[in-house]
């Protein structure tokens, strides 16, 4: 029991800074929306439309680079720290290649925006302008993630937290300057949010690089002074590990976007109630997601040390802590659901619907916690391909079709509206949790030599 308590303390020490960093990053999006809304409703809508396209694109790159964390954790645990700098350098090359792809996609996103039904031309122009300003921050964001993953792979999660707050503090005044045109800058409205956020990502990157170069704990693994060409073998391995994570993230984000589109014709009350419940549940999701990042680090480190039993301890402890967190957040959601909904809106019909949907959100928080921590465990074992297949099957083959049938058809029961989609979420997330646990048990029952060989690749 003592070893589990010790592991839980180490996991929480890693996870808490990640939680705070995630809150800071989420707050940046909130600040953009509020400040753009203060300028005009059209500009706020333009930022919302642009963000809905930006997020799937940038999260694809973000997911691809998550492969670095278990690789670095494993090298650190095995005492091969001299190889970490080369992996990080190749991570920068990968980030550069993906940045170009993302920038090309975002530059041409105007075709998607202008094809939307009945979109106002002025709104479309502002949304395109916002994206074309923001896309210049894509390399800065992804380079920052490489440096952050280096730190987190070495069990240093506080730098990411600090840089997240630096980004938030810089974002507010720079937003103000470019939205309203102060200090000789042009008045850009919502487009100014894109300029400011792009600049902030570069500030976060240079701040993180400055820390990495000066940190005593990383003195022995600093990047070599000489230029390093792309190493195709390393890049291929990182891509093989990262691509399934990237696709899983992409399909998860697009799932919620598709549900939002399917709910939109049901009316203002249904849309508002759905959005309130989804926004709050997304906030609660930060807790298990951050714990999953910590579990990836601990499992990778223990496998690097050559101890499959300690890796199992880290995995079980992460699941135990995650389940406890889920029960707490579910109880909080059930008890205060009406008060939470009132923070968003005062329409009685919206409050009633949002409160009902939050009950369903409370039910799936346990499954959500298990599946995301399970995903973190599998990343630690470098078994990322199964993550993609599990999430795709659970969300798109089981969850979304079931939700559609329950919400918008009479095939099984009378049309349930938004609640039907939330029943689909419960089915999808529960399926993902079960499949993740089955895959984890399958991996852990393999011979130690097989597990360690896979981890060392």
Swiss-Prot record:
One of its GO terms (cellular component) is plasma membrane. The keyword Cell membrane applies. The chain crosses the membrane at residues 11-31, 53-73, 93-113, 127-147, 160-180, 189-209, 243-263, 276-296, 314-334, 357-377, 387-407, 418-438. GO terms for molecular function: antiporter activity; xenobiotic transmembrane transporter activity. It is found in: Cell inner membrane. InterPro entries: MATE_fam, MATE_MdtK, MdtK-like, Multidrug-R_MdtK. Disulfide bonds: none annotated. It is a multi-pass membrane protein. It comes from the Bacteria. Keywords: Antiport, Cell inner membrane, Cell membrane, Ion transport, Membrane, Sodium, Sodium transport, Transmembrane, Transmembrane helix, Transport. GO terms for biological process: sodium ion transport; xenobiotic transmembrane transport. Its main location: membrane. The keyword Cell inner membrane applies. CDD domains: MATE_NorM_like. Multidrug efflux pump that functions probably as a Na(+)/drug antiporter. Belongs to the multi antimicrobial extrusion (MATE) (TC 2.A.66.1) family. MdtK subfamily. This is Multidrug resistance protein MdtK. It comes from Enterobacter sp. (strain 638). The gene is mdtK.
